[in-house]
Amino acid sequence: MCGIIGFTGRLEAQKILTEGLAALEYRGYDSAGIAYFKDTGKISIRKTVGKVKDLLAICDDENNSTCGIGHTRWATHGGVTNANAHPHKVGNVALIHNGIIENYHEIVNKYDLADSLISETDTEVAAALINKLYDGDPKATIKKAVAELQGSFAFCIMFKDQPGKIFAVRNVSSMVATYCDDGAFIASDLTAFIKYSKRYFILPEYTIMTMTADGIEMEDLEGKKVEPDYLEVNWDVTAAQKDGYPHFMIKEIHEQPTAITRTITPRIKDSLPCFEDDNIPDSFFEDISDITVVACGTAMYAGMVGKALLKNKFGIPVSVEIASEFRYEQPVLTDRSMVIFVSQSGETIDTLEALRLANKYTKKTLSIVNVKGSTIARESNYVLYTHAGPEIAVASTKAYTVQVASFYLIGCKLGLVSGRMTKEEAKTFIENLQEVPNLIESVITQAPEIEQLTKRMTNATNAFYIGRGLDYALSMEGALKLKEISYIHAEAYAAGELKHGTIALISEGVPVIAVATQSHVYSKVISNIREVKARGAYVILLSKDKDITDKSICDVHISLPQAPDEFAIFESVIICQLIAYYTSTGKGLNPDQPRNLAKSVTVE
């Protein structure tokens, strides 16, 4: 959600903070602010409603401070106002926060803090509490404060009488940190300081970190020293830049062939799926009674494709659960149940809490995540890292396709281990999977034609996506992409369900994107298309036909390269991504930063 950065060292802090916030802006862009130590020892704050560029307009050009904290906000408590923007300063304390303090009302009453508050935020309550408890010992005060707090939080804190120092502590909400030649860095995401260091560690929960220009020290709540566990990424700052593209989203669409190759290649040996490098033994895939996929948003829709594949091709009972629902229900799991958790960031709060619940019932938990060392990855029994590189655009593209590719690898392994698939069948399946990057490259060349057809879409208020089987699972992601970046109400329906209510919404000119790549239900989908066309729908048909002889069934036909049915969805999703992207830009919108959305949902 919110973006956090802190720095203390030998460089100008303001430049590092504002550059870092710009890199984190996908996590929130309602308001932005920084706090820093002045030469006088006082803490100065600059904050404003708007984006980082608006913050830069009010920053001090001659600011030579070398210690400060910065924040870009996605509003959860209180409206989008200057008073509610971070950092918050109360007395001796300046503080930034990502998370939600659930008992802030009780804290206000218990410590009589109302008179010291000027905002509507739970964050300012935390700052006021720390200031109230402060006795000159920052770490002791922070320990007392966090003992009072309920909810999730990641805090960076400065005390007026501790110049050059930043203190940090977290629960649930993640922060990464490093120390290098330039100084000490902390942030909610590595992209904020990748320019300075590719090494990082994840701040452990309930560990208090003290940052100075000379180093980093950590201790737990009992005062025991904690050593950082450093990791290193294999990408650099250029991977988090647009690199000549107008938006991150279109860049990341083009990166999908490479991303999929990086996901599948290390896990294929002799044309068969192999998870040795992930330290996952074949025994993990044995004696599986059922599979539950738990995720949110796009990751959940990747799971829907996984479900369709695993159930229909490999005969495995699969359910897909929304993480925010699963975590509050009584799970029906046994020690033979496999539960797969999908999250690009590895920090999605509902998915993480669902994992913690599932771990009480089964030892067969597997996560599919992109960020190495993330909390979900660490707490799963096993993890598949997708190696997709940073995804900056809020609307996910390459994270989705690599998650789907991961399900294909898992499905093939399960098919082999269970005996439902022969080695020769598995080799053919994997060889087809290896061709997916080439298929995507071919589809991307159709981008100019997609841009032209979306000119008809920009004036739409509603749109519908239909398909059957894998195509229906794919359609859910297509509809999500369109609605989140173009603000057109879009829904996906199983094509056979149209007559059970949805067809009442079809009227003259309403766009219907029909996906028909599954041979065994192709004729059925065509019949459903005729039904919506008869009601005046503007039909865009995606199919593997080179040409449509009956031109009356659609207004636009997008021909996809020939591919086995199971793999055609990789082609279709690229078209859906391009439709969403060009519809958004055609409306003059910024697809990278859709309203009200943030990239990593780390609060409930």
Task: Mark where each language-model region is.
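Conserved short alpha-helical segments that host acidic/polar catalytic motifs at enzyme active sites
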Residues: 1-242, 246-247, 258-289, 301, ...
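Glycine-rich oxoanion-binding loops at beta->alpha junctions
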Residues: 50, 66-83, 269-282, 306-342, ...
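Active-site phosphate/pyrophosphate-binding segments
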Residues: 256-260, 264-292, 382-511, 584-604
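Generic C-terminus detector
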Residues: 538, 553, 563-604
